Amino acid sequence: AIYYNEKHKPLGYVVYYLRNEVFHIKEIVALNSEARHGIWNYISAHKSMLNTVVGFNYSGEPMAFLFEDSEMVENIEPYIMARIVDAEEFFLEYPFPLQPDFKIHFRIHDEHAPWNDGDFAVWWEDGKTCCRRVEDAPDVNLVELNIRTLTAMMLGYKRPSYLYEHEYLKTEYYMLQILERLIPVGKPCFSDNF
C-alpha cells in the first residue's frame, strides 16, 4: 500500500500480508509524519479483520509512544552489525554537516585491523574532508576510542555524549560538544539485504 499526499505525491508505503487474523508488516517507510499517520490509519482500518499487528522497526524509534491506547510488546534485537573497515577512507567519505577550522585527532584502537590502529588527523579544506594517519597525535582536540565505539558513534547508533558518559570515548568536554554538532542525528536504515 502506498500513501499519497493531496498532490498525489508518494510519501510512504507499507509492504504487508494478512494471515490468520495477523497483519504482518514486512517493510514500512514514511518520509514524514503525514505519511506515518496515513499508513497507520490504513493499518487500523483493518482492525475488524485482525487481532495482532507484527513487524520490524528498523529505525529504533520506540513505537509504543506513538499510540495512545495500545497493548504493545516491543523487543529490541540487533538487526545488522556494522564495522568500519578502513577508518581513513571512512572519514574521507563521511557527510560531516559542518567543517571546523581546526584539526581533530582520533586515537583509534583496533586489534583486528592494524591499519586502523593508531592516530588520525581529520580536517577540512575547500569544502572537502581530509584525513591522514599521524604519529603521536597531540593531546589537543584528541578523541580516543576503539573501532567499535567509532562505528557506533559515526553511524548514529549511539551519540557521543552517551559514549562519553559510559566511558567508551575519552576526550575533553569542549570536544564532546563539537562531536555532538559534527555527527548528524539519525541512524542509517538498511531495510533490505542481499
Regions found by a protein language model. Give the residues of each.
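Intrinsically disordered, low-complexity, positively biased terminal segments
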Residues: 1-194
